A protein has these predicted regions:
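Short linear clamp-binding motif
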Residues: 2-25
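A polyanion-binding, active-site-adjacent surface
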Residues: 17-18, 22-172
Length: 172
C-alpha cells in the first residue's frame, strides 16, 4: 500500500467504522445537528417551532402574507423535501406545494411510486414573499435557523433541496 493509499484509507476510516457497517442498512436515525429530538416528543418540538414562527417579530414576509405555511406530510418520514417558499396558492391554503409546483411535485413522486403523504415537506421561508418574488438573502438567513431546527426535528435519512434557494439556506 502506497503512502497516498494509506492516507485515503485512514481518512475513510474516520468517517466509516468498518465494524459498524450494518448502520448503513438500519432504520436508526442519523443525527445531523446538536439538538436531540429523540429525548423529547417530536410533536411538541414541531408545535413549539410552529409557534415560534407564528410569533416572529419585525418580519415583512409575515406582515404581507395571509398564513403561515409550515409543513405537510408525515413527520416520521425518512424523506424530507425543502422548497423555496410559499406562492399565492400555498399562502391561501397554508400548506407547501399546493399550487402549480405542487402539481409537478405530485407527478414526479407518482412517477417513482412515492405517495406525497409518506414524505415530509417544508420551505426555506414560511411566509409568502410579496408578488411571489424569490426570498431575499436577509430573509433566507433569518429563516435558515428555523429550517435547521425543522430538519433536526424530522431527522430524515434523505433530504431533498428543491432549487438554489434551499441550497443557499443551508450551505450559503
Amino acid at each position: 500500500m502506497t503512502l497516498e493509499e494509506k492516507n485515503q484509507y485512514e481518512i475513510l476510516n474516520e468517517f466509516i467504522d468498518p465494524n459498524e457497517i450494518e448502520f448503513i442498512f438500519s432504520d436508526k436515525p442519523i443525527n445531523r445537528f446538536k439538538t436531540k429530538p429523540e429525548l423529547e416528543d417530536k410533536i411538541a418540538l414541531l408545535t413549539k417551532l410552529k409557534n415560534d414562527l407564528q410569533n416572529i417579530k419585525n418580519c415583512e414576509l409575515k406582515e404581507s402574507a395571509k398564513k403561515l405555511v409550515f409543513s405537510d406530510g408525515n413527520s416520521n418520514s425518512k424523506i424530507m423535501i425543502v422548497g423555496e417558499g410559499p406562492g399565492q396558492k400555498e399562502d391561501e391554503v397554508g400548506k407547501p406545494f399546493v399550487g402549480d409546483a405542487g402539481l409537478l411535485l405530485n407527478k414526479m413522486l407518482k412517477a417513482i411510486n412515492i405517495n406525497r403523504q409518506d414524505i415530509y415537506i417544508t420551505n426555506v421561508v414560511n411566509y409568502r414573499p410579496p408578488n411571489n418574488r424569490k426570498p431575499e438573502p436577509a430573509e433566507i438567513t433569518r429563516y435558515s435557523e428555523y429550517l435547521r431546527k425543522h430538519i433536526s426535528i424530522i431527522n430524515p435519512k434523505i433530504l431533498i433541496l428543491m432549487g438554489s434557494t434551499a441550497m443557499e439556506s443551508l450551505f450559503g
